[in-house]
Structure formats: C-alpha cells, structure tokens
C-alpha cells in the first residue's frame, strides 16, 4: 500500500508514475474525498470545542443556581452531531482505504517504461540452446510415452489443468525440489520453513493478492469462522511471518525459503497453455523471501535473482534474464526481474522465475517494521520475493533439454544424488 501522506502531498506526481504502469488513478475522487474529510474534521473539531465549553458552563450555571436544562439540551444535541460526524469520517476513511488497497506500487526509477511484455528489456543470457539432431518432442509426449505423465487420469480426478506424475518422473520432480531447497539453505543462507497452505484474508491483503485479485484464488468458505484461501505462492505465508512485528535490526536480513504446492484459478488464462504442465491449477514451487532494511533492498534484489539463476546454471538449463517494464510488473513490485528458461519444443524462452523488490508496499499493509538503531524508532522494512524455482516448469525444461533420440531422459549431474545415482530414465 502506498503512503497516504505521499498521496495527499504529491497526488498528481503519483498519478503520473502510476500511469506508466497503465493504472489510471482517480485523482478527482481522491481530491473530493480529501476535501470532504477536511470539512467534516474541521466541523467536528469546532463542535467538540463548543461542546466542551458548554459542558463547563453547565457546572458554572449550576453553582449560580440557574436553569441548566437549555445547556444540557445543547450538549446532548452536540453529542448527537459529533456522533454523526464520527460516522461520516469513518465512511470517508473507509472509501479512501479501499482506494488505497487497489493502487499498485510505484515503479523504481530504474524500471524501463513500457506498456506490456514487449517493453521488457533483456539483461543477460546464460547457456546455449542444444541443437538436436533428431525431431524434438515436447514434455507431454516424453512423459506419456512411458505412462509417467498422465493428464487423462488427473482430469478424471480433478478436471482440467492438473497432472498426475508417476514413477521416475515423480521422483525427478521431488529431486528438483530437494536440490533447490538444499542449495538455498546450504549455499545461499536461507532458513527453511514449512508453512500452512491455507491462510486467512488478512495475510493475502498484506502481500497484495486481496482485495484486487480474489478471482485468482481458491477460497474455502466456513460458517462461523474466518474464510480460508489456498496459497497462490509461499510468498504469502513466508512474508506474513513478520506481519505486525517490530524486528530487531540485528536480525536483518531475514531470509526464508519454502517448498510448497501453489493453487491458482488461472481465471484470466482461458485458452492459454492448455497442453501440458506449463499452466496448472496446482503446482509446486520453491519460494525465497527476504526481509531487509530499506537502504539494502535494491542490492538484495540482485542477490535474490542471482540465487534463482544459480539453480538454472547448476542444472545446465539455458535461460535469459529480463528487467520487466512498468506495464508488465506485478501489483506489489517496485522492480522485477523475470528468468525465462529455454523450452526446445516451443523454440522459445518461457518464464520460470519472477524476482521482485516490493519496497515498503507490503510492509505498510502488514505493519511489518524494524527498530532503527540510530533513531530508536520503528520503520517499515522492505520485502522481496522470488521463485527459486517453479518446480513443474523446471521439470518441463529438464525433460525437454535432456531428451535423447529414443525418448529417454538424461539425469542432470546435480540431480543424480537425489535419484539414487540413476543416470537415465526411460
């Protein structure tokens, strides 16, 4: 959430910066609400001062033996007006808060300006796509050949956009997740966490999924209890660990990593990536989250992105790194890098990780703070998150990039210890 003080003092500047994201801020409505708020607040404060004076007069009139009934009636009338003013102020503030919750973050000055993914800027590439000397098969054909990737049974169980993995491919999927977690914990300094897969609405509001993106979530309504939502990413549960907390500066940076299933309705993805595992309602992901001091968040974004890239490098998967433009960034981000891995059957790079610095945007929504050692006062932390990596899409990339002419799959060297030394599957 943006700082309401910034919005009041630099409304047009904020609107101009948001316009670069394709977001039209309703400046007129905000100005009208602010004017209403000031008017009601001024009137209420004047009325309160008058009521206090009348209340004081009652005591004085009583001492003089005068009739206090008219004064009492005035005070009672003012109390009613004050109560009505309070209700009016609360209604105005509720609408302002609702508007604030729907405003995306302001892009960092280093973010390229653009309308959509065509405005993204390639930062670097790593690896060279393999030139196969045989017809390339996609991951669906490779997996179904041996009955290890079963979309038909998954559809019988759950409907479209689900997958059933069996045998060596299920083991390879597990190996990938274990490899990623171990790398981030032992070499990148993250603390592993096992988190709930169901969260309440305030957690999703804290990270920015609610209220704007509720249609993308799976919701479990409960009578007499708070509704629960299946997490769309472990970013939600990991980041909210510090919600409502004041962290000692000596604890920073805090670095969490978790391997969880993720659940998304893919409400806006009708007709896109309907074949295979690229876009699923349920998929596994290894998620990294960092909680840092404000002055260190841009540096942390570079290291977070490097941590995700290391996974791809050790797996020997060609990829490219993109700086997302203003029009393609996620709701909560001030700056984002996307990693795209090479998918041979599609002859192009596909997103496999998104690494974002959210500044104090999520922290303000969550009231996550640290105590500044210089001032002794609480200040908002900065939060970052990134996929390290999406396990299903990494499996797709391994199957396709390590395929052989007979349809078998070579096991990447770094995964062999997790596969019992197995070198080839199929």
From Swiss-Prot:
<dbReference type="Pfam" id="PF00587">
    <property type="entry name" value="tRNA-synt_2b"/>
</dbReference>
<dbReference type="GO" id="GO:0005524">
    <property type="term" value="F:ATP binding"/>
</dbReference>
<dbReference type="GO" id="GO:0005737">
    <property type="term" value="C:cytoplasm"/>
</dbReference>
<feature type="binding site">
    <location>
        <begin position="233"/>
        <end position="235"/>
    </location>
    <ligand>
        <name>L-serine</name>
    </ligand>
</feature>
<comment type="function">
    <text>Catalyzes the attachment of serine to tRNA(Ser). Is also able to aminoacylate tRNA(Sec) with serine, to form the misacylated tRNA L-seryl-tRNA(Sec), which will be further converted into selenocysteinyl-tRNA(Sec).</text>
</comment>
<dbReference type="InterPro" id="IPR002317">
    <property type="entry name" value="Ser-tRNA-ligase_type_1"/>
</dbReference>
<dbReference type="InterPro" id="IPR015866">
    <property type="entry name" value="Ser-tRNA-synth_1_N"/>
</dbReference>
<keyword id="KW-0436">Ligase</keyword>
<feature type="binding site">
    <location>
        <position position="387"/>
    </location>
    <ligand>
        <name>L-serine</name>
    </ligand>
</feature>
<dbReference type="GO" id="GO:0016260">
    <property type="term" value="P:selenocysteine biosynthetic process"/>
</dbReference>
<keyword id="KW-0030">Aminoacyl-tRNA synthetase</keyword>
<dbReference type="InterPro" id="IPR006195">
    <property type="entry name" value="aa-tRNA-synth_II"/>
</dbReference>
<dbReference type="InterPro" id="IPR045864">
    <property type="entry name" value="aa-tRNA-synth_II/BPL/LPL"/>
</dbReference>
<protein>
    <recommendedName>
        <fullName>Serine--tRNA ligase</fullName>
        <ecNumber>6.1.1.11</ecNumber>
    </recommendedName>
</protein>
<dbReference type="InterPro" id="IPR002314">
    <property type="entry name" value="aa-tRNA-synt_IIb"/>
</dbReference>
<keyword id="KW-0963">Cytoplasm</keyword>
<keyword id="KW-0547">Nucleotide-binding</keyword>
<dbReference type="Pfam" id="PF02403">
    <property type="entry name" value="Seryl_tRNA_N"/>
</dbReference>
<dbReference type="GO" id="GO:0006434">
    <property type="term" value="P:seryl-tRNA aminoacylation"/>
</dbReference>
<feature type="binding site">
    <location>
        <begin position="351"/>
        <end position="354"/>
    </location>
    <ligand>
        <name>ATP</name>
    </ligand>
</feature>
<dbReference type="InterPro" id="IPR010978">
    <property type="entry name" value="tRNA-bd_arm"/>
</dbReference>
<dbReference type="GO" id="GO:0004828">
    <property type="term" value="F:serine-tRNA ligase activity"/>
</dbReference>
<comment type="similarity">
    <text>Belongs to the class-II aminoacyl-tRNA synthetase family. Type-1 seryl-tRNA synthetase subfamily.</text>
</comment>
<comment type="subunit">
    <text>Homodimer. The tRNA molecule binds across the dimer.</text>
</comment>
<feature type="binding site">
    <location>
        <position position="287"/>
    </location>
    <ligand>
        <name>L-serine</name>
    </ligand>
</feature>
<dbReference type="InterPro" id="IPR033729">
    <property type="entry name" value="SerRS_core"/>
</dbReference>
<comment type="pathway">
    <text>Aminoacyl-tRNA biosynthesis; selenocysteinyl-tRNA(Sec) biosynthesis; L-seryl-tRNA(Sec) from L-serine and tRNA(Sec): step 1/1.</text>
</comment>
<feature type="binding site">
    <location>
        <begin position="264"/>
        <end position="266"/>
    </location>
    <ligand>
        <name>ATP</name>
    </ligand>
</feature>
<keyword id="KW-0648">Protein biosynthesis</keyword>
<keyword id="KW-0067">ATP-binding</keyword>
<dbReference type="InterPro" id="IPR042103">
    <property type="entry name" value="SerRS_1_N_sf"/>
</dbReference>
